[in-house]
Design a protein with these regions (language model features):
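Left-handed beta-helix
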Residues: 2-109
């Protein structure tokens, strides 16, 4: 037989199985909360974390503000003091220092 090994894990959600759409939705929500929480701890203001979707490769500068219903994906970089207004979709793009983007804009690099 094969050897079975237990691996300690602080958060069971990091290793949960995904066997259907319900589990997939729960895992996506967990990752959204985890990413948003980390950025808020680093000083990014996210007015509505439930409607801000930030991909794992997105980076932020200092004192960035993210409004509700925003989508930031790919290798997007948001520099210091920028503000992302509601309804904005950014993918593989750069937001310059103190730039205000949106509302209701889609920008792809």
């Amino acid at each position: 037989g094969k050897k079975v090994v237990a691996i300690p894990c602080d958060d069971w959600q990091e290793v949960q199985g995904i066997n259907g759409n319900v589990e997939l939705a729960h895992a996506a929500k967990y990752m959204q909360e985890r990413i948003n929480t980390e950025w808020m701890k680093k000083g990014v203001t996210i007015y509505d974390p439930n409607t801000a979707y930030i991909g794992p490769n997105v980076t932020f500068g200092t004192d960035v503000i993210i409004h509700p219903n925003t989508y930031l994906y790919g290798d997007t970089t948001v520099e210091d003091y920028a503000e992302i207004l509601p309804g904005t979709w950014l993918e593989d793009t750069k937001v310059s220092k103190a730039e205000i983007v949106g509302p209701f804009i889609r920008r792809k690099g």
